Amino acid sequence: IGHHAVLITIPGSDASLRPCLYMSHQDVVPVVEGTEQDWTHPAFSGDIADGYIWGRGTLDIKEQVFGVLEAAEYLLARGKSFARTAYLAFGDDEETINLGALAIAEHLKAQGVTLEFVLDEGGCKIEPGTAFGAPETSIVSVQLMEKGYADLELSVHSIGGHSSRPYGGTSLGRLSGAIADITRAPFAVRLNSAMTGAFETLAPYITEEPLKTLVR
């Protein structure tokens, strides 16, 4: 789809169930020219050594691409059937302009597909629960929501003139002020259902203040 994006469909047996989508991306961040010698193993070698696969993109995010494909192949090879249709979607330019993901989304929209859920990268590692006040507990964050974003285009019109006799400030100054106003107006912080559930689950393991008192 698009340039080199890939969309694989595994049909489900129950048409009443909305399909799910497992997503990742094939591309990786490039290696800066002149730094090739700084890598323990060649950046694109995929060397297997010391119990690890070495290379650019092994964690961002080739392991998820191969993990999803390996899991699907494993189940299908053993005759596993799916009640819910599953889509495996792999963009090819996530690190740059995301046209691959856009092409996949537009294709699914044109087909009238409404998804039950999307499983994407992020929060997929075991780490100490320090951020939750539970440093002695290991956690894996399951991210249930996605932050949105907005693109803003600001235009300023001002009276022309000479820098020696500015009239009412410069366009650049006014534009900078508008950008500063936006920066000083972040969205209000709120405790949503996902975070509430996380704290309720972790409450017995939280040992650090002030969270220890707040979750009791």
Where are the model-predicted features located?
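Acidic-enriched catalytic cores of C-N bond-cleaving enzymes acting on peptides and small amides
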Residues: 108-111, 116, 124-137, 142-151, ...
